[in-house]
Design a protein with these regions (language model features):
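Serine-esterase "nucleophile elbow" of acetyl-processing enzymes
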Residues: 174-244, 253-261, 391
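Secondary-structure junction/capping motif
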Residues: 17-19, 29, 45, 221-229, ...
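A structural signal for short, well-ordered beta-strand segments and their strand-loop junctions
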Residues: 85, 239-242, 305
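Short, charge-rich amphipathic segments
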Residues: 156-166, 182, 217-230, 255-269, ...
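Short, flexible loop segments at the rims of nucleotide/cofactor-binding pockets, characterized by
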Residues: 61-63, 242-246
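Alpha-helical cap/lid subdomain in secreted, periplasmic
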Residues: 67, 71, 77, 252-405, ...
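N-terminal secretory targeting modules
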Residues: 1-205, 382-431
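Active-site-proximal loop/helix segments of hydrolase catalytic cores
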Residues: 248-250
Length: 431
């Protein structure tokens, strides 16, 4: 049988089951929509109001993007060989449709939703179900569809039928769509148990504050975005508060003090300043205030700030984008001075790699799955430096300790998939 398939919701026999409300990870809160179904929200209500307010650059877009389930997932353990997820998808947001129209115009990728439900088993990708296949016909009713996943392939057992309850226990992660919202019912299986994964206090928490690239445009699967890849491969507990079209909006952080404190915060904003006119002075104040608020919220979290690449992107007349690298750098420097003076972990600023045209799905710089993989590898290497480097804490500057010198790689190295010369050769001696 196929690893994943779709069928209409029905009253088929339940062997083991759990409500999605018990299994959701990566959401700020859950909205009860009746009959024990829930809608996961990535943002607290105060944040949602701020995203749709006059303080936002593109409130109409943000109101559409906030309900999307980027980074939200169901995590559980089961001995079932087949699972069924009850899900009702939201309609595709108009803002998403406009981006996908640009993808179709470029022609590198085939037309479609470019989003999916994705399943990991024991930390490895199992299957994706494109949303084009999940969206139910009207006659299926308000409860939407059932998506069935097989966890035990017949070929692995000599094409013999796997009896219910005889499969090995597995840890399963179901990634919800990145580019639209959803309502969730039960997860059912044919095994003897299906239970939530116990929270492990030793697992580091990762919070990503980014734009459409970090949200998951347009890499075809929610499990293929760079935040999802980094979280899966490093075993991090991810909350992804990335929003298509977002910039440094300080008011969007209001209410985040209720979130469980992250161990690592990645800020990946700035590229969208290329689309609008803005004063350098105003944007400088907003970027400084934003990063200062992040620092105040989580003073002990490792902070990675990703600056958009300097080249390869045109901007409208009057845009501050040509200066955004310096604007972000100056704001990071203020946070760094404060952290170093207090003996806390320092902030790390890096420039994102510039992807080639063959790695971009459209003219707006959204990566393909291959491009997202390169970004994930780049971020992963930077986290090695950030989490292992002591010179950032002691000196506020990268390049002093063996940990960072041993793992440093340039953006060009990341794109080429190989290391260049010894990075120590390019670091100036400041003794």
């Amino acid at each position: 049988m196929e690893a994943a398939r779709v069928r209409a919701a029905n009253a088929s026999e339940v062997v083991c089951a759990a409500w999605a409300s018990e299994l959701v990870r990566g959401a700020a809160w859950l909205e009860d929509v009746g009959a024990k179904w829930v809608r996961p929200h990535r943002f607290w209500p105060e944040q949602e109001r701020a995203l749709g307010s006059c303080a936002a650059w593109y409130p109409g877009i943000y109101r559409q993007m906030a309900p999307c389930c980027a980074g939200v997932r169901l995590e559980f353990e089961t001995d079932a060989s087949e699972l069924v997820l009850e899900i009702a998808l939201d309609a595709e947001p108009a803002a998403t449709s406009r981006v996908l129209a640009g993808v179709a115009e470029k022609g590198l990728l085939a037309p479609g939703a470019h989003d999916a439900l994705a399943v990991d088993v024991d930390g490895k990708r199992l299957a994706d179900v494109p949303l084009d296949a999940v969206e139910p016909p009207a006659e299926h009713g308000p409860r939407g569809s059932e998506v069935a996943f097989e966890l035990a392939a017949g070929a692995a057992s000599g094409d013999l039928l796997q009896l219910p309850g005889f499969a090995d226990a597995s840890r399963v992660c179901v990634w919800l769509p990145a580019l639209r919202g959803a309502r969730l019912g039960r997860v059912r299986g044919n095994g003897t148990f299906l239970r939530p994964v116990e929270r492990d206090a030793t697992v580091r928490r990762l919070l990503v504050l980014g734009d459409s690239v970090a949200q998951g445009f347009v890499c075809d699967s929610p499990a293929a975005s760079w935040p999802a890849i980094v979280a899966r491969e490093r075993g991090l507990d991810l909350v992804n508060q990335s929003v298509g079209g977002q910039v440094f909006q300080p008011s969007a952080l209001v209410g985040l003090d209720r979130l469980d404190a992250p161990d690592v915060v990645i800020v990946a904003l700035g590229a969208n300043y290329s689309y609008g006119r803005a004063s350098v002075a105003v944007v400088s104040r907003e970027v400084t205030e934003y990063l200062s608020r992040v620092d105040a919220l989580w003073p002990d979290a490792s902070l990675l700030v990703m600056v958009p690449p300097a080249g390869g992107k045109t901007s409208v007349p009057g845009s501050c984008y040509p200066f955004i690298g310096k604007i972000i750098g100056d704001a990071v420097a203020r946070v760094r001075v404060r952290r170093v003076s207090e003996g806390r972990v320092a902030v790390y600023e890096v420039v994102q790699p510039e992807l080639g045209e063959e790695l971009l799905s459209d003219a707006d710089g959204h990566p393909t799955a291959e491009g997202a993989r390169i970004l994930a590898d780049f971020v992963d290497a930077r986290l090695d430096e950030l989490l292992e480097c002591t010179c950032l804490r002691d000196f506020g500057q990268f390049g002093r300790c063996g940990a960072c010198l041993g793992t440093a790689a340039t953006p060009e190295d990341a794109i080429a998939g190989e290391r260049g010369d010894d990075p120590a050769d390019s670091i100036e001696d400041e003794e």
